[in-house]
């Protein structure tokens, strides 16, 4: 079923691409856009995970670099019956995490230094279990392709403003059509992202709670991440907003959780669903699930040469 949804998503995104191409250059522009979309879909399928990890300058770690973090992912992957994904750390004080990859055999999980430093062992396990659930449900392919194509559609819409309005380019709709393309194409891409992310986050929350065995640890983590995510900026996410739906909590500082156009469900609704799940589990168990009250363990964060306590990450080639 996920493969069918992914195919429908790619078809819709391709149609958007072609529509903007038509506005820019008529039938010829539409055909060029079709070829571009086909090439981009092919390239994104094989490379979008690497592109996203590169956007966030994620660094791969192993058991020697981050034994506790790596061990959490390894044990949870075993619980879920999944191959061991590649494990990455993102240099960002904002607590957050995401998963990417075209299938469970070629998947990766990434957590920020802020998450590893501010959450308890059990809360980190809940977050990583959520990300492994996305991998198990093959959401990662759809989310990563959506991020890549939505960003491209937005850029093409801006391109239309500069090259779609003059009369010599075979544009059948004129400047009005260009304005429509600039507004409608990115907005439609955003609606697709919303529909994908909102429905899949609930499923990943539930499956993640099953994998880690404690819904309340994940609920506690969501509350902490949501509380910090909009107070601590993620500069790379601000530069690449099309990837926001990939994170466990929206990383954009301007995002309000009650916003009609949020890429994520309301955090309190997610927490309430996990608390209901905990009560259901408690009813069938002699050891009821409890909130995470454990003292936060000291956690080794990989020695990557990153600064600590800075308000802005080091500048990279995209800055």
Curated annotation (Swiss-Prot):
Gene Ontology, cellular component aspect: plasma membrane
Protein's cellular compartments: Cell inner membrane
UniProt-annotated stretches for the region Disordered: 279-319
Bound cofactor: record note: Binds 1 zinc ion per subunit.
Domain of life of the native organism: Bacteria
Xref: Pfam families: Peptidase_M48
Residue ranges crossing the lipid bilayer per the database entry: 6-26, 28-48, 145-165, 172-192
Keywords on record: Cell inner membrane, Cell membrane, Hydrolase, Membrane, Metal-binding, Metalloprotease, Protease, Transmembrane, Transmembrane helix, Zinc
Positions that bind Zn(2+): 130, 134, 201
Top class in the EC scheme: hydrolase
Named cofactor requirement(s): Zn(2+)
Molecular function terms from GO: metalloendopeptidase activity; zinc ion binding
Protein name: Protease HtpX homolog
Gene name tied to this protein: htpX
């Amino acid at each position: 079923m996920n493969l069918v949804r992914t195919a429908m998503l790619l078809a819709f995104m391709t149609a958007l691409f072609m529509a903007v191409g038509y506005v820019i250059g008529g039938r010829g522009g539409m055909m060029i856009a079709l070829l571009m979309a086909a090439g981009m879909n092919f390239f994104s399928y094989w490379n979008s995970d690497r592109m996203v990890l590169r956007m966030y300058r994620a660094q791969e770690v192993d058991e020697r670099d981050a034994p506790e973090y790596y061990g959490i992912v390894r044990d949870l992957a075993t619980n879920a019956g999944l191959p061991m994904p590649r494990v990455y750390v993102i240099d960002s004080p904002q607590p957050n995490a995401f998963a990417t990859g075209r299938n469970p055999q070629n998947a990766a999980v990434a957590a920020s230094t802020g998450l590893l430093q501010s959450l308890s062992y059990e809360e980190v396990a809940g977050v990583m279990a959520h990300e492994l659930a996305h991998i198990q449900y093959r959401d990662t392919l759809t989310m990563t392709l959506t991020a890549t194509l939505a960003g491209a559609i937005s850029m093409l819409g801006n391109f239309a403003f500069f090259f779609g309005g003059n009369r010599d380019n075979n544009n059948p709709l004129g400047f009005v059509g260009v304005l429509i393309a600039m507004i409608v194409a990115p907005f439609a891409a955003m609606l697709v992202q919303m529909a994908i992310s909102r429905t899949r986050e609930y499923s990943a929350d539930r499956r993640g709670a099953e994998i880690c065995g404690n819904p309340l640890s994940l609920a506690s983590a969501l509350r902490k991440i949501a509380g910090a995510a909009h107070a601590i900026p993620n500069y790379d996410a601000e530069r690449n907003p099309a990837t926001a739906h990939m994170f466990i909590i929206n990383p954009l500082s301007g995002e309000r959780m009650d916003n009609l156009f949020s890429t994520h469900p309301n955090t309190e609704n997610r927490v309430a669903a996990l608390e209901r799940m905990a009560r259901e589990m408690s009813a069938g168990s002699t050891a009821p699930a409890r909130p995470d009250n454990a003292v936060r363990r000291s956690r080794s964060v990989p020695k990557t040469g990153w600064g600590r306590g800075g308000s802005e990450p080091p500048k990279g080639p995209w800055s």
